[in-house]
């Protein structure tokens, strides 16, 4: 018997409170079974928000979704954490860093379409950089793109507004120009909380609010007594 495989068989599962849970390594309730509305929203081409408190399983859910979606072969799902963009309010810098995180998320993926991101100039207009990156990548893929952005809370207000405006531009024009089939924005706040936070800082969103791109949101609840008992 392979020695490493033998060691894996001998490993005991652990309770995990530091980062996403891994099936086979940690005691966990299957994330997709508890949050099956995510698949429905993706199938219906929605852009949506998942919000919940810390350590409630958001990242575990996203990673489970990526694995499940890609195993089915219908869509290409990509997980992208925006934690490294934390606190960058200037969109000229923040938007460039978001694209850098997209490239990082694709680095180890065997997807030829990722090469199109390298063709986009680093000095491109920041007001269209996200839009062009997602549009070109979507066009180069052989399957519809599902983007799962984690830690959206980290974005500074200026970066967040510019980021969402470009997603909205892609959303409303995707009948003519390829763009993401579905996008999830994940963090601790609901979309209404983002709007309130920015308005409290005295910034106007205008009539074409970038938050109008979001069609639905849901939260991850606490475990039920039945789930704990299982």
Positions of PLM-derived features:
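Walker A/P-loop-proximal flanking segment of P-loop NTPase domains
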Residues: 2-56, 60-69, 132, 136-137
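The catalytic "switch" region of P-loop NTPases
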Residues: 18-20, 159-230
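Non-catalytic architectural context of zinc metalloproteases
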Residues: 66-75, 92
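An amphipathic alpha-helix signature
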Residues: 91-99, 225-229
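The start of beta-strands in P-loop NTPase/AAA+ ATPase cores
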Residues: 46, 76, 145-146
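Mid-core helix/loop region of P-loop NTP-binding domains shared across ATPases and GTPases
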Residues: 101-149, 153-165, 173-182, 210
């Amino acid at each position: 018997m392979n020695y490493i495989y033998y060691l894996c068989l001998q490993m005991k599962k652990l309770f995990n409170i530091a980062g996403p849970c891994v099936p086979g390594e940690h005691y966990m309730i299957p994330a997709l079974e508890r949050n099956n509305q995510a698949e429905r929203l993706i199938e219906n081409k929605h852009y949506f928000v998942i919000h919940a408190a810390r350590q409630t399983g958001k990242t575990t859910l996203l990673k489970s979704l990526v694995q499940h979606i890609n195993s089915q072969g219908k869509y290409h799902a990509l997980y992208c954490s925006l934690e490294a963009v934390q606190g960058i309010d200037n969109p000229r810098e923040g938007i460039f860093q978001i694209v850098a995180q997209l490239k990082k998320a694709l680095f180890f993926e065997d997807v030829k379409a990722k090469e199109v991101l390298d063709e986009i100039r680093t000095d491109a207009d920041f007001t269209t950089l996200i839009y062009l990156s997602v549009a070109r990548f979507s066009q180069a893929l052989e399957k519809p793109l599902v983007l799962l952005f984690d830690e959206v809370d980290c974005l500074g207000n200026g970066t967040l507004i510019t980021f969402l405006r470009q997603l909205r531009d892609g959303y409303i024009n995707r009948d003519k120009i390829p763009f993401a089939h579905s996008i999830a924005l994940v963090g601790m706040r609901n979309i209404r909380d983002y709007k309130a936070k920015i308005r409290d800082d005295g910034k106007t969103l205008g009539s074409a609010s970038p938050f109008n791109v979001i069609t639905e949101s849901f939260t991850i609840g606490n475990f039920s007594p039945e789930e704990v008992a299982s």
